[in-house]
């Protein structure tokens, strides 16, 4: 059965931490494709990039990733929907497109810890295998395993010092941030003066 990995997020902006997650997923699971699904940020403010720029930067990210391996795709399905999408709705969408593929849903440890609060979480476990990325040394794996069968998730430890929120602040403050992402994305941010309103 072919595998399709799904990364959801605003990627606002994309950085080398996102690249590390994608390349590690490729190495561990050998998916036929990795889909970057751009989602709306319910906490979006003036400091965030407009959705058109989020999509453009995600496409640049996919182009850079595509130089190193299998096909990387960008989906704007969630952006085009009215309102905000729940993860289960996104999974149903991709399952309808690829009914014979195994979906790998890549999430962070923070979301894993509150997984039982997600809408239709039991159906999520039926539609997808969870790939949980956690910082090395954390002990959170046991805390939610009571509701997630061990065969339905894989725990991956990886240290990622970068965060998009920190990058937005550094850009606004004029710090040295360009080396934390590919030059094509840094050039897009500079050309359009993104993240200048972060406080």
Swiss-Prot record:
It is an enzyme of class 2 (transferase). Transmembrane segments: none annotated. One of its GO terms (molecular function) is ATP binding. The keyword rRNA-binding does not apply. One of its GO terms (biological process) is NAD biosynthetic process. Coiled coil: none annotated. It catalyses: nicotinate beta-D-ribonucleotide + ATP + H(+) = deamido-NAD(+) + diphosphate. Catalyzes the reversible adenylation of nicotinate mononucleotide (NaMN) to nicotinic acid adenine dinucleotide (NaAD). This is Probable nicotinate-nucleotide adenylyltransferase. It comes from Chloroherpeton thalassium (strain ATCC 35110 / GB-78).
């Amino acid at each position: 059965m072919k595998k399709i990995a799904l990364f959801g997020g605003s990627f606002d902006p994309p950085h080398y931490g996102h690249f590390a997650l994608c390349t590690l997923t490729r190495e561990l699971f050998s998916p036929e494709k990795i889909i970057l699904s751009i989602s709306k940020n319910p906490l979006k403010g003036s400091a965030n990039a407009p959705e058109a720029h989020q999509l453009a930067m995600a496409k640049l990210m996919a182009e850079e990733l595509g130089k190193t391996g299998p096909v990387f795709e960008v989906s704007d399905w969630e952006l085009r929907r009215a309102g905000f999408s729940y993860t289960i709705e996104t999974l149903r969408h991709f399952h309808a497109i690829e009914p014979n593929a195994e979906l790998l849903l890549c999430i962070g440890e923070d979301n894993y810890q509150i997984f039982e609060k997600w809408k239709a979480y039991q159906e999520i476990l039926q539609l997808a295998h969870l790939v949980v990325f956690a910082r090395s040394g954390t002990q959170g794996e046991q805390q939610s395993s009571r509701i997630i069968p061990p065969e339905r998730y894989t725990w991956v430890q990886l240290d990622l010092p970068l965060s998009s929120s920190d990058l937005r602040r550094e850009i606004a403050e004029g710090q040295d941030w360009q080396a934390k992402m590919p030059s094509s994305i840094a050039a897009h941010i500079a050309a359009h003066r993104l993240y200048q309103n972060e406080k």
